[in-house]
């Protein structure tokens, strides 16, 4: 088979500094995804021929998937002191069927081409601090990622939209130099 995926995007992001302590980030992104997959039926491809009983070896079928999305991001940062910040952010994203075609994953087939795109919302609250005269960076964040139209492959090998999934998490990080001779990176 032959698969071709194309994407076009336009992205705008602005950081608005109200004063040295408060910064607002606002962004919008438009994505246009296009995937085309052409399959040539072969005499030994029993599964494909079984799905299309009238197919003969050498016949070709082409499946297309074209979608476009508008996604957003917003964040606010408070810097109580110069070496530390507290932030909150919100972002959306989308993942249409076939966008990852050609990289060894699902691509597009007649069975999944009409599935709904996965849509994601991510919220995060975190803090970042530079300590030891800016030699060490400490970070901590809690986050929630909510996905609608989640795709999953069942025991029978078919892919379907299974509804909503949610991930709640915490992320901790340490990066920098503890002393002139000791460096640390963990997270």
Where would I find each of the regions flagged by the language model?
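Surface loops and adjacent helix of pleckstrin homology
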Residues: 28, 89, 187
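Intrinsically disordered, low-complexity regions of eukaryotic proteins
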Residues: 16, 27, 33, 102, ...
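Acidic glycine-/aspartate-rich tracts in secreted/extracellular proteins
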Residues: 93-96
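Outer-membrane beta-barrel translocator domains and adjoining extracellular loop/strand segments
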Residues: 36-45, 98-111, 150-157
